[in-house]
Curated annotation (Swiss-Prot):
Main location: cytoplasm
Name of this chain's protein: DNA damage checkpoint protein LCD1
Cellular component terms (Gene Ontology): cytoplasm; nucleus
Organism whose genome encodes this protein: Kluyveromyces lactis (strain ATCC 8585 / CBS 2359 / DSM 70799 / NBRC 1267 / NRRL Y-1140 / WM37)
Any Pfam family hit: LCD1
């Protein structure tokens, strides 16, 4: 024990602790300052923590929003179910109320016997207040109308449509004509469901029996597809031998009747097959389209003077192009996907280009009905949205051919072409009797009856219709060019094209103001429509080309034409009214003097009938004025004024005004 208390080491430690200063007086150890890298690392760590907390908060809010949306949808669906149940319950209660009213009426209605016994009493006695109240409480009679639901049989309607189909001007239906037409040496197999049609047997009965059998089996679209299929099989089988040509135009007309029955019933696949089939048929025998422009002096013309075979070729081509045009019309009502399926097919596009080249070529004789078909087809294609890919490189070739047919005047001097098509009649259809005469109704034949090559001259009605459709061709071509220039402005718009447009615009306006000024005809209205679309085309090209292009153009004809539109407005001012009357009245006076000569024998010069004076003062003057200003609307006048102001200066405009409106 003494040794433990005597330890010097422990004493030293105790003394050191006793002598240590208090904690408040001891110096705090100073930490070395942190470096910038450590501070940046610390800040990044804090940012990471904050981001993690923010993401967790966003996740929590997102889950809360999802839960709220689910709750809202569930509440909404439950609310809708409750509303539906309440509506059903309300309808049930309404039915019960009506039933109770009917029961009440039945209970309060007296029997016939009691009514007959008390009739005299009710007539003499006054009604009591209770009876009046009861009478007022009686409900109004309600009647339930019974409507019969008729189910329309589309198949039977389609079958009747084919049975009653006639060509324009014909006395017999097409199927009746096919009842007297057979094949030469060709056996037909229209369908596996039908037996073979032997040669020298009529074609009408098997076609009729097949469609009659299918109309109760298939739906309308399936029936249309099957009918088009058997007609295509018949045409392809019959066209192998030239002796079987008699049946072809009538089968093509039935194909047109089939697709034209109801456009919505023709499927896209059927349209594509019809396009392919008809274009192949046209290309296989285009001799009718390749008639020489001029007769050869070396032609001996020793063939028989008959017309039936040329007539069959003409009807086949005309009806084929009518079918193509109708297919385009149906395709215009389809969606973009269907349009792409048909028109973006390379084979169909190539065949259509070949058919158009045959028709629009200036090396061959122009056939006006078919040219109308081609322009309508191209106008429909250029308006379709799905015909951009395959047709992009083909419009350049067609554009040149369209210009050639655009600037030349189409004449129709062949009386042999005066037949009506399936879509329109470009003449007066004076040759319609030949369609019935080519068929023998007394026997079944594969050869046509002999038709002599003798025709009546074209009537005034036919010539007027031909003029109308020739102007319509130019309108269609103008619209096609306008659409194409919107897409391919840089490649198609040229100086030559613009000069031809100016010349065509000037020539038609000159015809309207000189040759046809005294005429009141529907073709004049169509010509004014042509001038309107030409002006729109000129305006579009004018605002699209550069000033360098404009300086290279010859603008004298265009300037005069535009001045007539801008300053030939009859309702602008009294001064202008006097001036346009001064321009028109001398021309009208010459025509009126010619008309007065017809009345020299019946009337004196001073005692002309009253209608002559009214005609002099009102009717013809108004007709001439409308032609002079081209029936231009305000937008067209603004277009013409814009072009005219960019062409001429103010001094040139004043000089032109003085030169054209001189005092007489």
């Amino acid at each position: 024990m003494a040794d433990l208390w005597d330890d010097n080491d422990d004493d030293d430690d105790i003394l050191e602790l006793v002598n240590r200063p208090p904690m408040s007086q001891m110096a705090v150890p100073i930490k070395p300052p942190e470096s910038q890298a450590e501070q940046l690392m610390k800040a990044k760590g804090e940012v990471g923590v904050l981001r993690q907390k923010l993401s967790m908060l966003e996740k929590t809010l997102r889950e809360h929003d999802d839960n709220q949306k689910k709750l809202e949808s569930s509440l909404k669906s439950s609310h809708e179910e409750e509303v539906t149940k309440l509506k059903i319950e309300l309808e049930r209660l309404e039915d019960e109320r009506k039933f109770m009213l009917l029961e009440q009426k039945h209970l309060f209605t007296p029997r016939n016997s009691s009514k007959s016994e008390t009739t005299h009493e009710t007539e003499t006695a006054e009604p009591s207040p209770i009876e009046n109240k009861r009478r007022r409480m009686e409900p109004v009679k309600e009647y339930v109308t019974l409507t019969q639901n008729f189910k329309v049989d589309d198949g039977s309607l389609f079958y009747d449509h084919l049975l009653n189909f006639k060509l324009l001007g014909s006395e017999h239906t097409v199927l009746e004509m096919l009842d007297h037409i057979c094949t030469y040496k060709t056996d037909l197999i229209l369908s596996p469901e039908h037996k073979i049609i032997k040669a020298r047997l009529p074609l009408g009965p098997p076609i009729r029996s097949l469609i009659f059998k299918w109309k109760s089996i298939y739906t309308l679209d399936q029936l249309v597809d099957k009918t088009l299929e058997i007609l295509a099989i018949a045409i392809k089988s019959v066209s192998v031998l030239p002796e079987n040509k008699l049946a072809i135009p009538f089968l093509i007309s039935l194909m047109h009747c089939t697709i034209n029955f109801r456009h919505s019933a023709t499927s896209v696949s059927s349209l594509k097959d019809v396009f392919q089939f008809i274009t192949d048929f046209i290309i296989s025998d285009p001799k009718f389209l390749k008639q020489p422009l001029h007769e050869s002096p070396l032609d001996l013309d020793v063939s028989p003077d008959v017309f039936q075979y040329s007539m069959l070729d003409q009807l086949c081509m005309t009806y084929s192009f009518d079918v193509l045009e109708t297919c385009i019309v149906i395709l215009l009502n389809c969606n973009t996907r269907a349009q792409e399926i048909v028109l973006n097919d390379a084979t169909i596009a190539e065949n259509l280009i070949k058919c158009c080249n045959f028709t629009l070529s200036i090396s061959y004789k122009p056939i006006m009905p078919i040219i109308v078909n081609v322009t309508e087809i191209l106008l429909g294609i250029v308006e379709l949205d799905g015909a951009e890919n395959v047709w992009k490189g083909k419009w350049a070739v067609l554009f040149s051919k369209l210009i050639q047919n655009w600037e030349r005047s189409l004449t129709f001097d062949s009386v042999s072409l005066n037949f009506a098509g399936l879509n329109r009649c470009c003449g007066d259809n004076s040759n319609h009797s030949m369609i019935d005469n080519i068929i023998s109704l007394e026997e079944v034949r594969y050869l046509p009856m002999i038709i002599e090559n003798e025709f009546e001259p074209l009537t005034f009605t036919a010539l007027d219709n031909l003029e109308y459709w020739s102007i319509q061709i130019q309108i269609n071509i103008t619209l096609i060019m306008h659409k194409l220039l919107h897409r391919y402005r840089s490649t198609l718009c040229s100086l030559e094209f613009l000069q031809k447009t100016f010349s065509l615009f000037s020539s038609h306006q000159e015809l309207l103001l000189t040759v046809f000024l005294d005429r009141d005809h529907i073709s004049d209205i169509k010509r004014q429509e042509l001038l309107s679309v030409l002006l729109k085309l000129i305006y579009f090209c004018w605002v699209s080309i550069s000033d360098e292009y404009k300086r290279a153009l010859r603008l004298d004809e265009l300037t005069i034409c535009l001045w007539r539109i801008v300053y030939g407005w009859p309702e602008s001012t009294d001064e202008l009214s006097t001036e346009w009357a001064a321009l028109i009245n001398p021309l009208k006076a010459l025509a009126l003097e010619e008309e007065k000569k017809y009345f020299d024998d019946a009337y004196d010069e001073d005692n002309l009938p009253a209608f002559m004076h009214s005609e002099e003062l009102d009717i013809k003057r108004e007709s001439a004025v409308s032609k002079f200003n081209n029936n231009s609307s305000w937008p067209l006048r603004d277009m013409a004024k814009y072009i005219l102001e960019s062409i001429t200066t103010m001094d040139e405009a004043d000089s032109l005004y003085v030169a054209m409106v001189s005092e007489t």
